[in-house]
Amino acid sequence: MIAEELSDQNYMVRTRSEMYKIPYKEILYISSSNHSIEIITEKENFRQMISLREVLSHLPAYFQQCHRTIIINMKKVTCLTDNWVVLNGKEELPVGKKYLEKIRSTFLSQ
């Protein structure tokens, strides 16, 4: 039971020699390039060899894809335009047209 509760609050990252627990609340966004992802947190960044689609399937519903290469933590969104989201008042990321309506709907309902 405790392990399940921890997994509900953290994302596990495995590198070649280390494992990290990253609290979901600290994740700003996740970006992908070259068959790997980079998890951007408030304190540091982590790299993992995994697809963006696979990561998204393991995240809570408040993580949403806003671009073909980016997943954002909707709890961190402070501003939304037709082309951009702003996270924590400073990190600006693109929003693809394909994802805009879902992002807007979630943003307005929070």
Give names to the regions the model predicted.
Residues M1-N88, P94:
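Conserved binding/recognition cores within well-folded domains
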Residues R104-T106:
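Short, surface-exposed, low-complexity cationic segments
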